[in-house]
């Protein structure tokens, strides 16, 4: 029987947020790329919430944009509302979040993919992988029709579709999200190749018809004015558009009682659901049962699009039966006559144990095979997108015979995310958080371009125009910092009157603008009357200048911490090291080190089960090996 055969450079399996970033990277670097999807209509589909960004996730989107990824640019073309979160806190945790129009976002990303040279979309299900005889090198993929697609690298970005099952109450449907077709055979193919899979779960809330809601009983949540774009390349003037409102309501004790009365019908509590769910995105039934002292929980009511009446209920994820969900809805203020458009559900799916991966997202078992996105046990559109970009760029680097591209924990949230995935055994869907980043004052969302644009340019992902703008921004910041250092104001009556109006204490002698700006009550804006000669600078440059001045001491301290971190990262561990021969290591440490095979002492130090004493043993072993090699020479 004859089957279709085709030769390409790179195959990407799955066209969600990870898959499209990976495929775009490959094609933009000039490689013939085939992007497989179960349905071209679901390219970059936002299957759950209508948000992009948020706490720490906004950092990921901006880092992706700085490297040359597309999520930020497309979000700027598709948003309904934008807010900078955590503005009452320090700049390290400021995070941009946008409500996106789900349909428009997906359409805009599909338009990009369809018009990208070297990139071809193919509808179909991939059921197995082609490898060399030893099962150590990838050769391509096989589709459900028997067609063979040969490639130099293969990227698996299948999201939550592998053996997916959607569950609510007594109903269990063998489908992907929103009733879409699932993938049924690739899991077994991966198991046959020796990969370890695990079963995770996530959930989504009901959607309601906005016409059935009484918004006068809810708190209005407005967007920020002016809007800050996600992409450093977007002209801020183009995103100053009318924004859609979101709303805040609350659950109540009556609704909580309905949940408690029906908890035996919850598939999470009666044993029907086997997968592990995300700790930081609990269902409403989980919140009610685990926090009985709380008599209400916040529910954010968010539009799914400009031209649909569907509203998303953030905070009300549930897999309770349909009738119970409807009863709970109608106990909330403004929801007395609510009509449900879609029922909330939980979805179980297969994913890879991410300890199978190198920090390039290439598998340890099979050269040229990469995994990215929720398939790696992470959660969220943003976590998926950055993994897709990193897997894509590393696949390209490999087939071109170039060095891998890896970001460490001191360089980017992306580095923290991937390092956590490949060194820690994640027993639940991994969510990025600012608290996971040790050097978060250096890894702010506002300076992602200053940190990473040069790297993106070196990779061929950032244009000449974009790098020029970043270099000019960097130069303007440094120039203004020097000017403020060298500009003094005198201790006279007029200047002290201005200081009093801030209010700030008077000065007794001359002081530099930089020193003055360090005062807690002073900022770049309110000292402007004391600085009539200051140049015109964009708000983004002003922000960088102020942060550099106000947090100078903390920034210097973190830079010193990074230097100590880099020292450990530079201590490489031999690839052929046999941990079972290092007898002073504890058994657990030997087993974990042998399983994960860390590249350096820094990675080894972050492995659960490897103690400081084990690290000391490793350091002594490395020194002895160094001396032994010297003697052999």
Regions found by a protein language model. Name each.
Residues 312-378, 406-419, 538-592, 597:
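A glycine-rich dinucleotide-binding beta-alpha-beta segment and adjacent secondary-structure elements
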Residues 39-41, 84, 188-326, 334, ...:
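An anion/pyrophosphate-binding glycine-rich loop and adjacent beta-alpha core
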Residues 4-18:
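Beta1/beta-strand and adjacent pyrophosphate-binding region of the FAD-binding site
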Residues 436, 453-614, 620-628, 632-633:
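Extended, charge-enriched "interface" segments that sit outside catalytic cores
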Residues 13, 148-159:
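Short hydrophobic core segments
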